[in-house]
């Protein structure tokens, strides 16, 4: 057996934050910019060996993350500062490591997760924003956040989310368990906060698109429940834009003792 094969293997988890506006999604793809590709390149430079990461949730093009979690395996023994400060020094400015934690062999960023949490940020103002234009979705019609919140409560629990599932979704089942969904207003911002065991493709953005129709008084509150029962994607509203969506947290069993930093996004109170 070679010396290389005898080296111990370390499993490391990282918390990742990124502005997805300049990337073609999380997942590494040929000939396009991805968050995964940039992170793996930076980690490989620090580890001095090729690194492959596994993430909790593969976000789409333009979607952001403040609470993404990844893991990787390496034979490189490094101090925590190397996996945070060192990796950040090799990353572009719109991707950053937030924390590092050594994890046991049975940990997997995706399969060990018990829930994912997203926040969708709507800038509800007559005039469009400039500085935050890629970090929020602009909607100029006045939105009734309390009405949206009431309408959304029918989505709680285990349901068939076919009406809010992208046509190209590859999940084996449309059933998902929504643990909470809250709609609140913070000045000009309307925030849709949703947590579930997992999500079908475009689920959050499709729900938000329909909730905005309710909030603008273009549809009655009962419409969301009717859409859920219909199990027909063609009846729901258009998919909300990617810019306002953030993966803000991923839940894991307490035994892994992973850090839980403020969720953000940072321009909102947590």
UniProtKB/Swiss-Prot annotation:
The record marks 58, 78, 110, 126, 139 as: Interaction with tRNA. GO terms for molecular function: RNA binding; tRNA pseudouridine(38-40) synthase activity. Its EC number is 5.4.99.12. The active site is at 60 (nucleophile). It is an enzyme of class 5 (isomerase). Residues 107-111 are annotated as: RNA binding. Residues 168-172 are annotated as: Interaction with tRNA. InterPro entries: PsdUridine_synth_cat_dom_sf (IPR020103), PsdUridine_synth_TruA (IPR001406), PsdUridine_synth_TruA_a/b_dom (IPR020097), PsdUridine_synth_TruA_C (IPR020095), TruA/RsuA/RluB/E/F_N (IPR020094). Substrate binds at residue 118. The keyword tRNA processing applies. Keywords: Isomerase, tRNA processing. SUPFAM superfamilies: Pseudouridine synthase. It catalyses: uridine(38/39/40) in tRNA = pseudouridine(38/39/40) in tRNA. GO terms for biological process: tRNA pseudouridine synthesis. The keyword tRNA processing applies. Pfam families: PseudoU_synth_1 (PF01416). Formation of pseudouridine at positions 38, 39 and 40 in the anticodon stem and loop of transfer RNAs. Homodimer. Belongs to the tRNA pseudouridine synthase TruA family. This is tRNA pseudouridine synthase A. It comes from Shigella sonnei (strain Ss046).
């Amino acid at each position: 057996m070679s010396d290389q094969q005898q080296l111990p293997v370390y499993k490391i988890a990282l918390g990742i934050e990124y502005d997805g506006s300049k990337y073609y999604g999380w997942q590494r793809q040929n000939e396009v910019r991805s968050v995964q590709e940039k992170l793996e390149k930076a980690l490989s430079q620090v580890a001095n060996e090729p690194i492959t990461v596994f993430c909790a949730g593969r976000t789409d093009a333009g979607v952001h993350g403040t609470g993404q979690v990844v893991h990787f395996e390496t034979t490189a023994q490094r101090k925590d500062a190397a996996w945070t400060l060192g990796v950040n020094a090799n990353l572009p400015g719109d991707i950053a490591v937030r924390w590092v934690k050594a994890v046991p062999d049975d940990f997997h960023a995706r399969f060990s997760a018990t829930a994912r949490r997203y926040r969708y940020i709507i800038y509800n103002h007559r005039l469009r924003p400039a500085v935050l234009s890629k970090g929020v979705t602009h909607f100029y019609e006045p939105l009734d956040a309390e009405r949206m919140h009431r309408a959304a409560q029918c989505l709680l629990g285990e349901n068939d989310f076919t009406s809010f599932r992208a046509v190209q979704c590859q999940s084996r089942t449309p059933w998902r368990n929504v643990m909470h969904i809250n709609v609140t207003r913070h000045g000009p911002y309307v925030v849709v906060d949703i947590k579930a065991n997992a999500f079908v493709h475009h689920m959050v953005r499709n729900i938000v698109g329909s909730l905005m129709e309710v909030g603008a008084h273009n549809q009655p509150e009962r419409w969301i429940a009717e859409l859920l029962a219909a199990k027909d994607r063609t009846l729901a509203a258009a998919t909300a834009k990617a810019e306002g969506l953030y993966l803000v947290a991923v839940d894991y069993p307490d035994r892994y003792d992973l850090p839980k930093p403020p969720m953000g996004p940072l321009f909102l109170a947590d």
